[in-house]
Amino acid sequence: MKRTAVSLCLLTGLLSGCGGAGLDNAQNVRNQTQNQTKPIHVSDRNEAFNRHNENEQFGYVRYQKEQFDGEQQKTPVMNREETAHMISSLTVQLPHIQDAATLVTDREALVVYKTDSKNRELTADQVKKTAASVIPRYYHVYISDNPNHMQSVENYSNLGSGSRDIREIMSGTIQEMKTSPQGSPVSENENANGETRQDMKIDRNDKNAR
């Protein structure tokens, strides 16, 4: 009889423990499911791991489709000033580059640099690829190793995509910049500036419509 009572007590304890573990596991699953529907930001992690090695920390963010379907989300906007800063700072660190100025618009990056390179084509390709590595893929990159174009690019810095006749005004500068080496073609279907035939056709139509 005593053995039976002891066995019942042990069985009750095991069932209680399993029940508690089961509830804990279920709660963990619910928590994981809820967390998966929230964006994950690097800043959410323990800051102690990133306090002394900020430049070494990877960046990671995850979104799920329903987050944008179910509620109004603000469309991410690229900081053009910061992007221009990144391009210029990276460019000036390339071999034979002494000065670099960058203008980033809503669809292109204009990079003017001063160089003492004897291989202008190679340097142009390096500058172009550096800029392309920072901006969105659909952007076009125009470069020039003529320092005189720096002032033209700087003059546009106080303007914006909504400025009057900005496309027509900038097209002249872009055409002048393209007289400098532009590097190798981006792909079989794109020229050195990342323009396709369709892009160039649209540009011609825009000019004819003005």
Swiss-Prot record:
The keyword Ion transport does not apply. The gene is yutC. Keywords: Cell membrane, Lipoprotein, Membrane, Palmitate, Signal. Disulfide bonds: none annotated. Its main location: membrane. It comes from the Bacteria. The keyword Cell membrane applies. Residues 1-17 form the signal peptide. Residues 196-210 have a biased composition (Basic and acidic residues). A lipid is attached at C18 (N-palmitoyl cysteine). It is a lipid-anchor. It is found in: Cell membrane. GO terms for cellular component: plasma membrane. It holds the Pfam family Spore_YhcN_YlaJ. A lipid is attached at C18 (S-diacylglycerol cysteine). Residues 176-210 are annotated as: Disordered. InterPro entries: Spore_lipoprot_YhcN/YlaJ-like. This is Uncharacterized lipoprotein YutC. Residues 176-195 have a biased composition (Polar residues).
